[in-house]
């Protein structure tokens, strides 16, 4: 699929050279490169039979697109989401095979788990003994998105599932060799349809800072106050796994409070960091770039940590390498307006925000705007964009200073609040020159960088 217009193409986010992209898959480290795979349909800017696109990077920022890693064949109608592990000197992909039982009805299907391997991390071979895992009894047709990791000599898999009670759940399996799998437990399941949904997609289970964390994307949650206003959500359960393999945990918490964030995938990097990326769209996103022959992108990689009982996320330190020039290092006055390059980073610190009520800043081109406001009565940060269903809000912990780190990339904005306590991820289809406008309180510290305008190599 050929891109016909560059107007919305991103500068420093991973994209395809054309066609459709959704979930990140197989985030891994192999033979000196970070590898990122993703759900991909190369023949149209619409969802279609799923392939695995593939890119690699030395630094998490500059990506080289590689040949398609997996494609549908006579055995499966789609290669759905999954993960990657290094084993026996090879890079192994673990993915969901999607099988249509009635080509005339996309809702008639079954799913199973499969593996493929590569010696060089580029050319992959599907295992002749696929599938390696079929859905258990007491499960519906929803059985997908395996995330695999290794502990000692044992591989573990967490898998998204729907039980016969039509509630979402995460299943845990183990294997000595990626080929023979046996069940360990139902790691966790939804407490109710309304609160935690009918299906848990893209689960990811790991220990971080002494806590066990289950990331997933539940479907079917109903809005509750400021929470759960996207079509589908992404968030986490934080707790501890017990001796029976079950997660004893707190309530589900959204991990990003913007409109355009779904289907996370993490990697335990060689240096010990837990890194995460996600699809920087959602199934109800407008995706205006489809008019130009492409759709979808991934967020900038983020480093995770647990702090104050929450999962925090910040841009990986490698993002500093895309700074091409410092445009401002000082203060910004109340009421000021500052021009921003279409690929830029702004770091702002407000010292008077806790007692302020109203709009803090506006970011936009005069037609499409993002505004960020604060409500001290509810300790709420409120983000509004000039579209239908434009408001999203999150409660913030008490602070002395409010710090914002804002990444702008032509048709996207990612906002990190107070060192990653809250994030908002947005696709914004700006047409004109961008500016950052402060309202009634100044930024006591302001640093603005221009960022590289092209980090993808196709």
Placement of each model-derived feature along the sequence:
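Beta-rich carbohydrate-recognition and catalytic domains
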Residues: 1-145, 150-196, 207-257, 280-329, ...
């Amino acid at each position: 699929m050929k891109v016909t217009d560059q107007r919305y193409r991103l500068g420093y986010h991973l994209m395809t050279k054309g066609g459709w992209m959704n979930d990140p898959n197989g985030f891994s480290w192999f033979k000196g490169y970070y590898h990122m795979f993703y759900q991909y349909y190369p023949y149209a800017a619409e969802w279609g039979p799923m392939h695995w696109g593939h890119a690699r990077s030395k630094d998490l920022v500059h990506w080289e697109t590689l040949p398609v890693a997996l494609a549908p064949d006579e055995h499966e109608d789609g290669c759905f989401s999954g993960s990657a592990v290094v084993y026996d000197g090879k890079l192994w992909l673990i993915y969901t095979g999607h099988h249509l039982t009635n080509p005339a009805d996309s809702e008639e299907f079954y799913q199973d788990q499969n593996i493929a391997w590569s010696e060089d991390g580029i050319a992959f071979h599907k295992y002749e003994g696929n599938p390696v895992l079929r859905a258990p009894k007491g499960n519906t047709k929803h059985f997908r998105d395996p995330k695999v990791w290794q502990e000692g000599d044992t591989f573990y898999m967490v898998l998204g599932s729907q039980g016969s009670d039509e509630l979402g759940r995460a299943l845990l399996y183990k294997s000595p060799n990626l080929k023979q799998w046996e069940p360990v437990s139902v790691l966790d399941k939804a407490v109710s349809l309304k609160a935690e949904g009918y299906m848990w997609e893209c689960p990811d289970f790991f220990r971080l800072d002494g806590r066990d964390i289950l990331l997933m994307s539940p479907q079917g949650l109903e809005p509750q106050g400021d929470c759960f206003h996207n079509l589908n959500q992404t968030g986490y359960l934080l707790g501890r796994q017990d001796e029976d393999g079950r997660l004893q945990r707190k309530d589900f918490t959204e991990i990003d409070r913007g409109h355009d964030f779904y289907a996370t995938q993490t990697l335990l990097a060689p240096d010990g960091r837990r890194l995460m990326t996600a699809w920087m769209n959602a199934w109800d996103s407008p995706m205006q770039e489809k008019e130009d022959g492409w759709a979808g992108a991934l967020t900038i990689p983020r480093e995770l940590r647990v702090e104050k009982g929450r999962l925090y996320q910040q841009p990986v330190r490698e993002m500093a390498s895309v700074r091409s020039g410092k445009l401002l290092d000082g203060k910004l006055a109340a009421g000021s307006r500052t021009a921003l390059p279409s690929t830029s980073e702004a770091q702002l610190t407000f010292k008077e925000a806790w007692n302020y009520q109203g709009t803090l800043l506006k970011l936009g081109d005069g037609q499409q705007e993002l505004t960020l406001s604060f409500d001290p009565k509810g300790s709420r940060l409120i983000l509004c964009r000039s579209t239908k269903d434009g408001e999203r809000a999150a409660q913030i912990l008490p602070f002395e200073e409010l710090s914002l780190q804002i990444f702008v990339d032509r048709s996207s904005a990612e906002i990190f609040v107070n060192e990653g306590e809250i994030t908002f991820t947005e696709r914004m289809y700006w047409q004109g020159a961008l500016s950052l406008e402060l309202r009634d309180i100044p930024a006591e510290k302001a640093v603005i960088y221009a960022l590289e305008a092209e980090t993808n190599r196709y």
